Regions:
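Membrane-interfacial loop- and helix-cap regions that link adjacent transmembrane helices
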Residues: 6, 18-19, 24, 76-128, ...
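Hydrophobic transmembrane alpha-helices of multi-pass solute transporters/permeases
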Residues: 21-43, 47-54, 58-63, 118, ...
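Central hydrophobic cores of alpha-helical transmembrane segments in multi-pass inner-membrane proteins
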Residues: 37, 62-71, 163-172
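Transmembrane helix-loop junctions in multi-pass membrane proteins
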Residues: 38-43, 137-140, 168-177, 278-283
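Extracellular loop-to-transmembrane helix junctions
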Residues: 43-94
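Membrane-water interface regions at transmembrane-helix termini and the short interhelical loops
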Residues: 43-49, 144-151, 163-185, 243
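Alpha-helical transmembrane segments of multipass membrane proteins
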Residues: 57, 64-65, 69, 189-192, ...
Length: 303
C-alpha cells in the first residue's frame, strides 16, 4: 500500500531523547531544594540554641544529612540493573529502567521495594507524598506572607493560592527539564544571604537589640528541629540521582558534597550576622526584623 510505504521502518524509528543531568546540574538542584526557607528561619534557631552551639549544630547537621544522602545514593545503585563493564569505561553503565514502570518514576519507592517488598514500597510512597505535600504547603504560606507584606491590600492566603496555581503546571515536568529553574532559586538564595548580611552590616532600620535568651531544653529541642529541616529534602534525592547521566554513587557523592557545603556556608553567613545584630530580637522570619528598600528587595528574592 502507498500509505505503508510512507511510514518509516521499525528499525528507523528515532529513539526518544531523555534529558540527563550532570554532576553540576544535580548539585544545583539539591541546593535549590534545600536552601531558601532555612536562610530565613535558621537565625532564630541558632539564637535559641546559643551562637557557638548553634553554629556547631549546623555543621554537624550538614555532615549527618550529607552522609544519609550518600547512603540513599548507594541504596539506589542497588536497585538499578548493571550492564557488563566495558573496557575503558570509568564506571558501570546502568540499564535504563522501563519508562512506563512506576518505579522508574519513583526511585525512592524502588528502594523500599528492594528492602521490604510491596509493604516497604507503599510505606515509602505514603511518607514521601505526605512530606512533600506538607513542605509545599509551608513554602506557599511563607511566600504568601512575604507577598502580603509587600502588597497588604490582599491577604496572605490569596497570594498563597495564586502561587499554587502558578506552580501547578511545573509539576508535570521532569527534573531534567526544569534544572534551569534551580539557577534562579540559587540566585534568589544568594541574593537573600547578601541582603541579610548587608542589613546586618549597615545602619538599616531594624528592631532594637535584645539580650540573647537563656538556652533551655525546650528551646534547644526546637532549634534542633529547625536546623535539621534546613538540610531536608531527602525525599527527592533518589529521583535526582535517577536523572543523572551515569548515576554512580561516586558521581552522586560529588554533587552531595558540593551542594551541602554551599548550603552550610549560606546558612552560617546569614545566621551569625543576624544574631550578632539583633540578639534575642531575632524573629522566625529574619526579614520581618528589618525595614527599608533593601529589605523589600530581599522579600522579593525570598518569595
Amino acid at each position: 500500500m502507498l500509505g505503508d510505504e510512507l511510514l518509516p521502518a521499525a528499525d528507523h524509528v528515532l529513539p526518544r531523547v531523555i534529558v540527563k543531568n550532570g554532576i553540576v546540574q544535580t548539585s544545583l538542584l539539591i541546593i535549590a531544594n534545600c536552601a531558601g526557607a532555612g536562610i530565613l528561619s535558621l537565625p532564630k534557631a541558632i539564637n535559641q540554641s546559643g551562637l557557638m552551639a548553634g553554629s556547631v549544630l549546623v555543621v554537624c547537621a550538614a555532615i549527618l544529612s550529607a552522609y544519609t544522602a550518600d547512603i540513599l545514593g548507594r541504596c539506589y545503585s542497588l536497585t538499578t540493573p548493571r550492564k557488563k563493564i566495558v573496557e575503558g569505561a570509568d564506571a558501570y553503565a546502568p540499564e535504563e529502567p522501563c519508562e512506563s514502570s512506576y518505579f522508574a518514576r519513583s526511585p525512592y519507592a524502588a528502594i523500599g521495594w528492594k528492602a521490604a517488598g510491596a509493604v516497604g514500597a507503599a510505606a515509602v510512597t505514603i511518607s514521601q507524598v505526605l512530606t512533600q505535600f506538607c513542605v509545599l504547603i509551608l513554602f506557599l504560606l511563607i511566600s504568601g506572607i512575604n507577598l502580603n507584606k509587600l502588597i497588604p491590600q490582599r491577604s496572605s492566603l490569596f497570594f498563597s493560592l495564586v502561587g499554587a496555581g502558578a506552580l501547578a503546571p511545573l509539576m508535570l515536568l521532569r527534573p531534567g527539564h526544569v534544572w534551569g529553574t534551580a539557577i534562579l532559586a540559587i540566585l534568589a538564595s544568594v541574593i537573600l544571604v547578601a541582603v541579610v548580611v548587608i542589613l546586618c552590616a549597615t545602619d538599616a532600620p531594624h528592631d532594637p537589640y535584645a539580650p540573647p535568651p537563656a538556652v533551655t531544653f525546650s528551646t534547644f529541642g526546637s532549634a534542633f528541629g529547625v536546623i535539621l529541616f534546613g538540610f531536608g529534602g531527602h525525599a527527592i534525592l533518589p529521583a535526582l540521582q535517577a536523572t543523572m547521566h551515569n548515576p554512580t554513587p561516586a558521581r552522586f557523592r560529588k554533587a552531595i558534597v558540593g551542594s551541602f557545603a554551599a548550603c552550610t556556608s549560606m546558612y552560617l553567613a546569614s545566621s551569625i550576622g543576624s544574631v550578632l545584630t539583633l540578639g534575642g530580637a531575632v524573629g522566625s522570619d529574619i526579614l520581618t526584623n528589618f525595614s527599608g528598600p533593601i529589605n523589600t528587595f530581599g522579600l522579593i528574592a525570598g518569595t
